[in-house]
Regions:
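Cleavable N-terminal export/targeting peptides
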Residues: 1-28
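Short edge beta-strand segments in beta-sheet-rich domains
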Residues: 140, 215, 292-294
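Transmembrane beta-barrel domains of Gram-negative outer membranes and organellar outer membranes
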Residues: 21-153, 162-203, 210, 217-223, ...
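A short, acidic, flexible beta-alpha connecting loop/helix-capping segment that sits on the rim
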Residues: 280-286, 292-296
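A generic alpha-helix preference that emphasizes hydrophobic side chains
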Residues: 16-18, 124, 296
């Protein structure tokens, strides 16, 4: 994995010698940004952007509690098609309000039995405030407040569906999860670098009669964009998740923690009216998590 990432970065440097840009200059190439990592600059006052995503996930296996990879049994299959919409609105030139909804279709084949269910996943509400502008070696710095809203089905599982009817987030369905984070972006012409850290705090929820408290979890993301002529760009991204053991009826559930690390290269094309990106995501390591391969396509349009 590290060899692949190293070769990717080396290739970028060979393509063009970088000229490091002061963040205060007027180099602002249009871009859809990374897939998961936030970009720190917020929307201009009164501007609205809409960003739909189409995501196709194929599960090749899973990482168990010890981080060991186990492939799916022969003949078993799991896949998912997600459609997401992220909308952002600039309240002021430094403050924006965002919302994200998810609709998903789950497909499972287990020992020859096929299951298919669809429905809303969990939704998210965000507000972001830009504290610092990109200047000198200081990155654009933005604070994030977010709330996960449990709009996806999380209980009363149909045992004949092998879990296909459950639509809650992987960090725990059914809970309201407030979160707080920080986001950085830095222009280093012809590169743009982004990073974020977001800590979330799930609230207790009753699931099928059991008092369930999912552990706090941390999302940590980093991405780099490399801008080419004619509106093209290359993107590389790493996404991490760490979550502790959950509690059910007051007792800790051993080995219920979740960890994952996802690698994603992508290519984009953008102009001043529309920004596009196609990427491949692969979960390369984890614990108690699905080992997914994903194709992601997205574009941004601003009104």
């Amino acid at each position: 994995m590290l060899k692949i990432a190293g070769l990717y970065v080396c290739a970028l440097f060979l393509l063009q010698s970088p000229v490091f840009a002061d963040g205060a200059d007027d180099w602002n190439p249009p871009s859809a940004g990374p897939i998961t990592t936030w970009t720190a600059p917020v929307m201009d006052k009164g501007k609205l952007s809409v960003q739909p995503y189409a995501i196709y996930n194929i599960t090749r296996g899973e990482f168990n509690a010890q981080g060991h990879y186990d492939a799916l049994s022969d003949g078993d299959k799991q896949s998912q098609f997600q459609q997401q919409i992220l909308a952002k609105y600039g309240i002021t030139d430094k403050w924006e309000f965002d919302g994200q909804i998810v609709y998903q279709e789950n497909y499972i084949t287990d020992e020859g039995v096929k299951s298919h269910e669809s429905g809303l996943g969990d939704s998210y509400i965000f507000t972001r405030y830009q504290f610092l502008d990109d200047k000198g070696w200081v990155p654009t710095t933005t604070g994030i407040l977010q709330l996960k809203v449990p709009t996806g089905k999380y209980q009363h599982e149909d045992r004949d569906k092998d879990g296909a009817d459950l639509m809650g987030a992987s960090t725990g369905g059914g809970s309201w999860d407030p979160g707080v984070g920080i986001n950085f972006s830095k222009k280093l012409k012809p590169f743009m670098v982004h990073a974020d850290l977001i800590e979330s705090f799930p609230q207790e929820v009753h699931i099928d009669g059991d008092e369930t408290k999912f552990a706090e979890y941390l999302h940590y993301d980093a991405a780099v964009e490399y801008f080419l002529p004619k509106g093209f760009s290359l993107m590389m991204e790493l996404n991490g998740l760490a979550q502790g053991d959950k509690r059910v009826n007051g007792g800790m559930v051993p080995d219920s923690d979740t960890k994952s690390l996802t690698f994603a290269p992508g290519i984009g094309w953008s102009n001043d009216k529309i920004q596009t990106l196609i990427a491949y995501q692969r979960v390369v390591w984890g614990a108690n998590t699905a080992a997914n391969n994903s194709i992601v396509a997205t574009f941004v349009y601003t009104f």
